Amino acid sequence: MYELRSSNEGTVVRVEVDEGQMVAEDDEIAVLDTESGRVVIVTDVPGVVRELYVEAGYSVTPGTVVALIDES
């Protein structure tokens, strides 16, 4: 399992995927509102989203786990 982590501090504006959804490398997972503007979190690996740990309105910091992706 791959833990997709935020590299920025901000507030989640929206989540672009659902649990159980197939994703490809570079697919958008979530959008953050940061001090420097909007930032899109993309996945580095293809797979199935097994868990989402954030939703709109959540605050995240660098290292926060956003989603768990099953690469198998």
Indicate residue ranges for each PLM-predicted region.
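Short beta-strand-turn/beta-hairpin segments enriched in glycine/proline and small hydrophobics
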Residues: 1-11, 28-46, 71-72
